[in-house]
Swiss-Prot record:
InterPro entries reported for this sequence: Allophyco_linker_chain, CpcD-like_dom
Name used for this protein in its record: Phycobilisome 8.9 kDa linker polypeptide, phycocyanin-associated, rod
Residue ranges the record marks as coiled coil: none
Transmembrane segments: none
Protein role: Rod linker protein, associated with phycocyanin. Linker polypeptides determine the state of aggregation and the location of the disk-shaped phycobiliprotein units within the phycobilisome and modulate their spectroscopic properties in order to mediate a directed and optimal energy transfer.
Biological processes, Gene Ontology terms: photosynthesis
Localization, UniProt: Cellular thylakoid membrane
């Protein structure tokens, strides 16, 4: 079909193991995150570690909570 891409098994497994760290500012306490057992800091940055397959979902959640993503960086595993 037009617009679809076929991925091999290698590309799926490599994307499943990739992890990224979001630096977020402006998160605010609201009804959604009041369900957590901790408060969100009002000052400074919050760092959130996210697997590749959940990046879109996490970006939407951050936006709903009033946060702004200022940096996204890949986390690499130490060789060894």
């Amino acid at each position: 079909m037009f617009g679809q891409t076929t991925l091999g098994i290698d590309s799926v497994s490599s994307s499943a193991s990739r992890v990224f760290r979001f630096e977020v500012v402006g998160m605010r306490q609201n009804e959604e995150n009041d369900k957590n057992k901790y408060n969100i800091r009002r000052s400074g940055s919050v760092y959130i570690t996210v697997p590749y397959n959940r990046m879109s979902e996490e970006m939407q959640r951050i936006h709903r909570l009033g946060g702004k993503i200022v940096k996204i960086e890949p986390l690499t595993r130490a060789a060894g």
